Amino acid sequence: MNILRSVVSRGRKGLKQEKVNRSFAYLDMVYITSKVIAMSTPAAGIHKLYRNDELDVFKYLTTQLKDNWILLNLCAEETVYHLELFKPNVINYGFQDHNPPPLLFLWAIVMNMDALFQTQPLLTLVVHCKAGKGRTGTVICSYLVAFGGLTAKQSLELYTEKRMVRGHGLTISSQIRYVYYIEILKQFPNYLKAVEFNTGTTFFKSFKCLNIKKNSSLILSLHAFSKGRNINPVALWKSSDISSHNVSIKEGKRIWGIQCNLETSEKDLLLRVERKGQFYFPSSVQCWFHTHFQPMLVEYTNGINFQQGINSFLQGQQSISFSWSEMDNSRRSDPFFEQLTIVYENVF
C-alpha cells in the first residue's frame, strides 16, 4: 500500500523527508513553513490505498499538534474522506482543480488565514487539495506574498523547494498569474476597494492570433466562474468557424482576427482556444485573467510605477497579450499560434 502511495505522490516531498515517527513517514504532507503544511487529500475507502489514510492524518495532527491545527479543504469536488472526522477543525474553500479561484475569493482566503494566526498564535494550518500541489500551492504562495514578506517569485521558489523532489511546485500559468495579482494587491492595497466596489462592465471588442498554423481552425470562447454549486465555468461567448474570420499575412506570418462584441460584468475570465482541422487532432489551451489586474501586472513586471494611475485600469480601452507559453496546457501539444491579443474596454 505504501509503495502505491509513493508512486502516486512521486515528485512531491512528504514526511519521509522529515524526522518523524515511521508510522507517519508515508504521509504525503510537508511543512512549507513552521506554521503551514501542504498536503494531498485525506482519504477513506478505496481511495486510501493511494492517498493519505484519513485516520493516519487525524492521528498525526492530534498527536503532533494537539488541538492547534485547522484543515483548509480546497477541493470543490466531492471529498473522498469523512469531513466529520476533522470537524470542527476544517474550513472549506473549494475551487476547481487545475484553475485559480476568483481573485477576490483568493484574497479572502489569505486574509482569513492571517486572522486565524492572529487569534491563535500556536495554530498550524494544513492546506490540501486533491494532490496537494496546484491549488494548495496557489493559496500557500498567495499567503506568503500577502503576509509572509515574500515576493511572488520568492514564494514560488520556496514552495518548489519545500514541496517537490523534482519539477516545479506550481506549473499552471493561470495559478501562477493569480499569485502575482496578490503581489500587486499587497503592494498597492488601495486598489482593493476600487476593484471590490467597481460595478462597471467590460466590453470585449476583438481578438487577434499571431502566426496560426495552416489548415487549422480556431474557436475562441470566454467563460466566467460559476456562482452556483456547479464548479464548471459558465460559457459567456463562443466564436464560429474560422471561415467567417479575418486572416491576413504580415511579414510572412498569418494573423487571424475576430470581432467579439460581448459586454459582461465579470472581472475574472477564462479564455479558451480550441484548434480543429483536417490534419490535426482537436486540442485546446486556456488562461484565466482579471480584466483590471492583467494590464496592471504587465506594467508592474516592466517596472512601471502606476500608483497614481488606477483609473486607467478601471476604465478605458485595454490591450493585453498572452504568448503560447503563458497558456495553460500549452506543453501538451505543439504551438498552434504564437501570441494572442485581446482588446477590451472597462466601463463604469
Curated annotation (Swiss-Prot):
Superkingdom = Eukaryota
Question: Where found in the cell?
Answer: Cytoplasmic vesicle
InterPro entries xref list: Dual-spec_lipid-protein_phosph, Prot-tyrosine_phosphatase-like, PTP-SAK, Tensin_phosphatase, Tyr_Pase_AS, Tyr_Pase_dom
Molecular function terms, GO-annotated? phosphatidylinositol-3,4,5-trisphosphate 3-phosphatase activity; phosphoprotein phosphatase activity
Gene Ontology biological process terms in this record:
phosphatidylinositol phosphate biosynthetic process
As for what it does, the entry says:
Acts as a phosphoinositide 3-phosphatase and regulates PtdIns(3,4,5)P3 levels.
Name of the featured protein: Phosphatidylinositol 3,4,5-trisphosphate 3-phosphatase ptn1
